[in-house]
């Protein structure tokens, strides 16, 4: 059950950024959120995977054990969650609910499946969905293969999933090309600022 305030705040915007594995969501998101003129609060996701270089507990993710994550699932603590390549990812309801109750605009960096769930949940409420796309699938494969050392079957799973996810891009409000993280971040900041301005002016 979703808490009423989670979906009922009509003067707060929900911005979701998603895209295939390896497209650079985390890097672009960090650049966007460093801009103090972006009046958004990053909704920190929870995961069972190990931290990557430069990732900080409680800032990039809440890193937990599989046992703890599954306890949260049993308690219906997630807005959305998914399991991918052996690791869980999810958006804690309580955290998002707290931000919305405080009147904050929320920025979600979530998996594509989670974004689909969020679009349904927030239908009719202020929300912007952004899909980050790579310059080419060949470039995406290069990034995935060189980002970390993984077994070939895991890489194949990531690439297959990326194919399926890219086919869903037309479900999003905006598609942003990540040919340069700075340019992509600037485009997303412009989208957010324009949407916030419209919300302030019209309430919609």
Regions found by a protein language model. Name each.
Residues 40, 123-128, 170-172:
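Short glycine-/polar-rich loops that comprise or flank the Walker A/P-loop
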Residues 70-77, 91-148, 192:
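ATP-dependent NMP and nucleoside kinases share a basic, alpha-helical "lid"
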């Amino acid at each position: 059950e979703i808490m009423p305030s989670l979906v009922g705040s009509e003067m707060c915007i929900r911005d979701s950024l998603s895209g295939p594995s390896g497209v650079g969501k985390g890097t672009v998101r960090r650049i966007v959120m460093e801009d103090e003129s972006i009046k958004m609060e990053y909704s920190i996701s929870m995961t069972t995977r190990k931290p990557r270089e430069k990732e900080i507990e409680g800032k990039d993710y809440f890193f937990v054990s599989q046992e703890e994550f599954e306890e949260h699932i049993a308690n219906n603590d997630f807005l959305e969650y998914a399991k991918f390549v052996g690791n869980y990812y999810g958006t804690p309801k309580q955290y998002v609910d707290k931000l919305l109750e405080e009147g904050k605009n929320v920025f979600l960096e979530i998996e594509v499946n989670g974004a689909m769930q969020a679009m349904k949940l927030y239908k009719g409420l202020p929300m912007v969905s952004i899909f980050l796309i790579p310059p080419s699938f060949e470039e995406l494969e290069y990034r995935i293969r060189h980002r970390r050392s993984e077994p070939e079957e895991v890489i194949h799973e990531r690439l297959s999933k990326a194919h399926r996810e890219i086919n869903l891009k037309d479900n999003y409000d905006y598609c942003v090309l990540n040919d340069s993280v700075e340019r992509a971040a600037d485009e997303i900041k412009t989208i957010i600022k324009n949407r916030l301005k419209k919300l302030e002016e019209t309430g919609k």
